[in-house]
From Swiss-Prot:
Tissue expression: Expressed in roots, leaves, stems, flowers, siliques and seeds.
Keyword line: Chloroplast, Membrane, Plastid, Transmembrane, Transmembrane helix, Transport
Name of this protein: Purine-uracil permease NCS1
Membrane topology: Multi-pass membrane protein
Impact noted for substituting residue 426 to A: Reduces uracil, guanine and adenine transport activity 2-fold
Organism listed in the record: Arabidopsis thaliana (Mouse-ear cress)
A single GO molecular function term of this UniProt record: nucleobase transmembrane transporter activity
Length: 599
């Protein structure tokens, strides 16, 4: 037995926040509309469906029972308030007349999602899942900011020659700049309840979305390894002195570290998986309850350095070692590195904002980023500067500093603080995005837990102990290097969502493999996005190869481009994408204007 059904939905170009639920009769003037048809076929062994845009036209109310669409007229299939205008600007029946199933406020039916493109971790969030208040979002950022890498980044700027105030100014400036793309990228996550991998489908294509999500996942795996290594160092700090002086603590040349330190790394690696396995709710609770503890422990460290150094006057007496010209030469790559520090989260922030109660909650919660970064940077810079007075040399690594302080109580507090700070940062910042990327790659096989496990395994492959061997390799090779990958992705996604699609997404088509789907493009790939991505990366490659000593001599222009990799790659990729898509849009408009609407 074979059955089929056809349903039509009108998508109006109205701002989603200007209208709540109104009847069709509330329309007062001419507006643009898109007519979509959804056709499904079902027999005893197979079910298939597709959704396509039939036509775009004007809709104008003529009377209470008569409406004009382009050159055609119609009367509502269901009278009165049975036709409603949802917040996303979709005219639809309250219930699907054909199937009897409830249609979502954004005009889609989850039962029509292609099973190869969705599972429980990829579906749009429901109202009951949206539990993140502004306080939860702020707590998330406190947990992310208060950590060893943030402290180490601030200390690295002093270590490279900056004065304390120059280091803080660099960090705060970078995070104020970052706040703009952070809030802009979070908006579709909250509005539509979709994660970063699903949002990427709108610009890169249904299958092409694997490219940006896997690149983001790769960076996340590297960061996961770095954070886990730091947590392992905290365990190493707890070990008795005679064990740390044993033969097991000798570095193996082929490994790049000692068997003892590597074992501590693996122990912490295993401990994190217990929390990761609980999913997003476990992460939210961890961040919320850890925030006050981390603030208290950070305050204790600042108080200790204040007393030991003899006050802020002595703590902050370390002046800049740079001339004016040398400072500006260091400032711009340092600014890029600091923006790159959280550029990973700026890209996949929809993974978190999709759980926010409202746009207000996500915006207010994220404004805390530059504030928290400024405060914690002050702690990091002040304590690092004080070490030159207390110990006679600058110690930018907090784990090394805590080892120098000594004492059982200090050691225990250090273990708790470093472990908690590492867990809150690592799990939220470096597990969620790679895990979701792997789920998006193969929803039938990967769950969030399985994706997190593979992320952890790849974190070992990155050999984080080598990335942390010096301030220069951490700032110039790692942070700036990966910004060349993330910058163009961010530029493409933001240009597509705000300039090309005007914040309007067809959620049903984001989960459809139909060739007529809006985001199927060419066999599931948007060639324009791929070309723009390559265009954004290529100019940075020579500078990166020079930095890792693969190229001996390059033009000074390539050095400047690499030092500002995030800005150049973001702007170039976004501009190239806008040019290509604008030209394609004009061609499509000319084709559609010569055809007749199918009504």
């Amino acid at each position: 037995m074979v059955s089929n059904c056809l349903s039509l939905s009108l998508h109006l170009n109205l701002h989603p926040h200007k209208h709540n639920r109104h009847s069709l009769s509330s329309l007062r003037s001419r507006t643009k509309a898109k007519l979509y048809q959804h056709v499904s076929f079902t027999d005893s062994s197979h079910k298939s469906s597709y959704t396509s845009c039939v036509s775009t036209f004007d809709i104008q109310r003529k009377s209470s029972k008569h409406y004009e669409l382009g050159k055609h007229s119609f009367s509502p299939i269901l009278p009165g308030d049975n036709l409603v205008l949802s917040r996303s600007g979709v005219i639809r029946p309250r219930l699907s007349a054909m199937t009897g199933s409830e249609i979502n406020d954004h005009g889609y039916d989850e039962s029509q999602f292609d099973p190869s493109l969705t599972n429980d971790d990829l579906k749009p969030t429901t109202p009951s899942q949206r539990t993140f208040s502004w306080l939860d979002m702020s707590s998330l950022w406190i947990g992310l900011v208060v950590g060893v890498p943030t402290y180490y980044l601030a200390g690295s700027l002093v270590d490279l020659g900056m004065a304390w105030w120059q280091g803080i100014a660099t960090v705060v400036t970078a995070n104020l700049i970052l706040l703009v793309p952070l809030v802009l990228t979070a908006q579709p996550g909250t509005l539509y309840g979709i994660s970063f991998p699903v949002l990427a489908r709108s610009s890169f294509g249904i299958r092409g979305a694997h490219i940006p999500t896997l690149l983001r996942a790769l960076v996340g795996c590297g960061w996961y390894g770095i954070e886990t290594w730091i947590g392992g160092e905290a365990i190493f700090l707890l070990l008795p002195g005679h064990i740390k002086k044993s033969a097991l603590s000798h570095t193996l040349p082929w490994l790049g570290t000692s068997p003892l330190e590597f074992s501590c790394f693996i122990v912490f690696w295993l401990a994190q998986l217990c929390i990761v396995w609980r999913g997003m709710d476990g992460i939210r609770k961890l961040e919320k309850y850890s925030a006050p503890i981390l603030i208290s422990l950070t305050s204790c460290l600042l108080a200790w350095s204040y007393l030991k150094a003899g006050g802020f006057g002595h703590m902050l007496s370390l002046s800049s070692k740079l001339t004016s010209a040398q400072f500006w030469t260091l400032f711009f790559p340092s600014l890029t590195a600091n923006i790159s520090f959280w550029a990973t989260l700026a890209l996949n922030i929809p993974d978190f904002s999709r759980f926010a109660k409202s746009q207000t909650d996500q915006i207010i919660g994220q404004v805390g980023l530059p504030v928290f970064m400024g405060l914690f940077t002050f702690v990091g810079v002040a304590v690092t500067s004080s070490t030159s007075i207390i110990f006679g040399r600058v110690i930018s690594n907090p784990i090394e500093l805590l080892g120098q302080i000594g004492g059982l109580a200090t050691t225990l507090l250090a273990i708790v603080g470093i472990s908690l700070a590492t867990l809150t940062t690592n799990i939220a910042a470096n597990v969620v995005a790679p895990a979701n990327a792997l789920v998006n790659l193969n929803p039938k096989f990967f769950t969030f837990g399985r994706g997190a496990f593979l992320t952890a395994v790849l974190g070992i492959v990155f050999q984080p102990w080598r990335l942390l061997k010096s301030s220069e390799s951490f700032v110039y090779t790692w942070l700036i290097g990966y910004s060349a990958l993330l910058g163009p992705i961010g530029g493409i996604i933001l240009v597509d969502y705000y300039l090309i699609k005007k914040m309007k997404l067809n959620i049903g088509d984001l989960y459809s493999l139909s060739p007529s789907g809006e985001y199927y493009f060419s066999k599931g790939y948007n060639v324009a996005a791929v070309v723009a991505l390559v265009a954004g990366i290529i100019p940075v490659v020579p500078g990166f190869l020079h930095k890792i000593s693969a190229l001996s001599k390059i033009s000074n222009g390539f050095v400047v481009v690499y030092d500002n990799a995030l800005f150049f790659s973001f702007i170039i990729a976004g501009f190239v994408y806008w040019i290509i898509m604008s030209r394609l849009g004009r061609k499509q408009s000319s084709l559609s204007s010569s055809s007749h609407p199918l009504l």
